[in-house]
Amino acid sequence: LDLLVTAMGQPNRLFLNNGDSTFADATATAGIGTRYGSSSIALADIDNDGDLDLYIVNYGAKSVLKDGGKLDIVRENNRLTVRGPYANRIKFIGNEMFEFGEPDEFYLNDGDGRFTLLEWADSRFKTHDGEPLTEPYRDQGLSAIFRDMNGDHAPDLFIANDGFTEDRCWINDGSGRFREISPLAIRQLSYSAMGVDFADINRDGHDDFFVVEMLSRSHERRLTQQGTVPGSSIAPGNFTHQPQSRRNCLYVARGDGTYAETAYFSGVAASEWSWSSIFLDVDLD
């Protein structure tokens, strides 16, 4: 077995197993040595060619706002806008300034220890309404997992994103091309998602999944955890809006491609400052 390691602001590394308990650093030829703020990885054969392809979740190697980046802010058409090198990282929503993350990276395995970076805007990735992406999402990514969510034997992809950036769910069409799941399939999102895992928790033959966040189990502590980001109004008739809440979310599959969010009903909405989760049979029942 070989070894992939992500790094924050340093090249992600590939170590090839020499077969004698030693490893050779093959990063220079692997094609994955970017310097983003990588937080985790997921592997699956998305194009059915017999080798594992690679998804790298990126957050941000540095914070533009906290590390003192110089911003060029102008007012255009009565709206505040950031220009220059940080235009993609810093955006105004209303009069509030928000810092976005770095784009995730999706690599196809060439089968010889090297990887080819996929372009987000090459029509391989489509929005939920079928339009090709024109630029990558810049989310604050923390975790990703491949799972066949719709039973077509092709690995789909779920990404848990921190902060206000929405979680992403990509459905594989079987050829390694992806389309965002309909917002009507997943109606509720966690606000600062940290980790995700899948399992069939009710034995109905369909995978369910759990996303962890940071809500305290103590009522007193919850009162000190209120965020400062103001709420946003939802226009009448906007039925595709997915509200984000500061708590865990448990998604139970209905069997028709949609999910019921049951964290409060199931008693798992709060688990303190949680970073990851995993399903396993602890009591052997």
Q: What do these predicted ranges mean?
A:
Residues 1-285:
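Acidic, glycine/proline-rich Ca2+-coordinating loop motifs
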